[in-house]
């Protein structure tokens, strides 16, 4: 049954490319920072961080996050896996460990069979098992387009908690997954994906950001976030602005999927790419079109963006290598200039 279904044809958006643009989100969230007055709320929405953290006691906090979206791939089981991997990532990005998840499902019951939704949930449950947590329940509604995701609860020690706005001048920047996921999934939706590229983006999207829990324990890691729908530049702007610094990025050093630029030449540009640039482009130094299209590419279940102090770099790279990650710096953070990000 599922082989004949193309889930991406039932939605107007795909994955984290469904996100409301940063510019519109600023209007929606204007004034909401007042919620941070609770002293037990260690991390709220003031910094647009990956998750909220609320104190359990003086040493530990509960981490809470939710993430859901429309299909980014056609296969129902893979859609569930990707959505779950993406949602759990926010816990890891805070330096925490996930405890349990609750499913969020919107389904066009008069258009797509219930058995297809069951496959989606099975994919989500599979990833929860890989993360060592239960899929403990959920909520579903009849919706015009398929939607799936998780609300995830985790725990973090305060001394290990990582934010996206605490980087320091001199920190080196690292990215744990290549860019181009939005580009390749757009090629798939347009039926232009070459045979040798089938499954490439999917496999990255289904890779848990579990290393974040280890990175959180490193004193040299000063800030961390995951790269999702706002693209690398969007999350760099958040980190740089929040930390009152400027990020300098070496374009040639940024990891990208091998065929990403080929598909850009074929016109496989996600709709969210230009919306992203329109939202934060004025805070970035001018850059060539191809760089803009790659660096603003909306990532679904993208990698961790990590700011590492020079004195902690050797330990960080050793831990990364132990976890199977061969990383190289993509740039650094310097004292604040007129712009948030410069691409070299």
Swiss-Prot record:
Its EC number is 2.7.9.3. It is an enzyme of class 2 (transferase). Keywords: ATP-binding, Kinase, Magnesium, Metal-binding, Nucleotide-binding, Selenium, Transferase. Its cofactor is Mg(2+). GO terms for cellular component: cytoplasm. The record marks 19 as: Important for catalytic activity. The keyword Nucleotide-binding applies. InterPro entries: PurM-like_C_dom (IPR010918), PurM-like_C_sf (IPR036676), PurM-like_N (IPR016188), PurM-like_N_sf (IPR036921), SelD_I (IPR023061), SPS/SelD (IPR004536). GO terms for molecular function: ATP binding; magnesium ion binding; selenide, water dikinase activity. It catalyses: hydrogenselenide + ATP + H2O = selenophosphate + AMP + phosphate + 2 H(+). Belongs to the selenophosphate synthase 1 family. Class I subfamily. Homodimer. Synthesizes selenophosphate from selenide and ATP. This is Selenide, water dikinase. The lineage of its organism: Bacteria, Pseudomonadati, Pseudomonadota, Gammaproteobacteria, Pseudomonadales.
């Amino acid at each position: 049954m599922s082989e004949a279904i193309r889930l991406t044809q039932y939605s107007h958006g795909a994955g984290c490319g469904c996100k409301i643009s940063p510019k519109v989100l600023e209007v929606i969230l204007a004034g909401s920072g007042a919620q941070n007055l609770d002293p037990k709320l260690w991390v709220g929405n003031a910094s647009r961080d990956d998750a909220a953290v609320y104190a359990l006691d003086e040493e530990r906090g509960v981490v809470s996050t939710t993430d859901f979206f429309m299909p980014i791939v056609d296969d129902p089981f893979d859609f569930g896996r990707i959505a779950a991997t993406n949602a759990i990532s926010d816990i890891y990005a805070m330096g925490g460990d996930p405890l349990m998840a609750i499913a969020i499902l919107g389904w066009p019951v008069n258009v797509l069979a219930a058995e297809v939704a069951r496959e989606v949930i099975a994919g989500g449950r599979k990833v929860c098992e890989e993360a060592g947590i239960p899929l403990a329940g959920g909520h579903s509604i009849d919706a015009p387009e398929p939607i799936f995701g998780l609300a995830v609860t985790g725990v973090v020690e305060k001394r290990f908690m990582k934010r996206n706005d605490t980087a320091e001048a001199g920190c080196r920047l690292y990215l744990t997954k290549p860019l181009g996921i939005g580009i390749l999934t757009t090629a798939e939706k347009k039926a232009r994906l070459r045979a040798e590229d089938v499954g490439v983006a999917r496999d990255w999207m289904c890779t848990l950001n579990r290393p974040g829990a280890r990175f959180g324990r490193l004193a040299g890691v000063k800030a961390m976030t995951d790269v999702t729908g706002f693209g690398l530049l969007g999350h760099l702007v958040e980190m740089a602005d929040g930390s009152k610094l400027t990020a300098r990025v070496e374009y040639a050093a940024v990891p990208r999927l091998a065929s990403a630029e080929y598909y850009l030449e074929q016109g496989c540009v996600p709709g969210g790419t230009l919306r992203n640039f329109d939202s934060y482009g004025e805070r970035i130094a001018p850059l060539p079109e191809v760089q803009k299209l790659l660096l603003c590419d909306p990532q679904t279940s993208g990698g961790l963006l990590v700011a590492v102090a020079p004195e902690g770099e050797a330990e960080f790279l050793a831990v990364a290598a132990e976890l199977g990650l061969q990383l190289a710096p993509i740039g650094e953070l310097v004292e604040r200039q007129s712009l948030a990000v410069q691409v070299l």
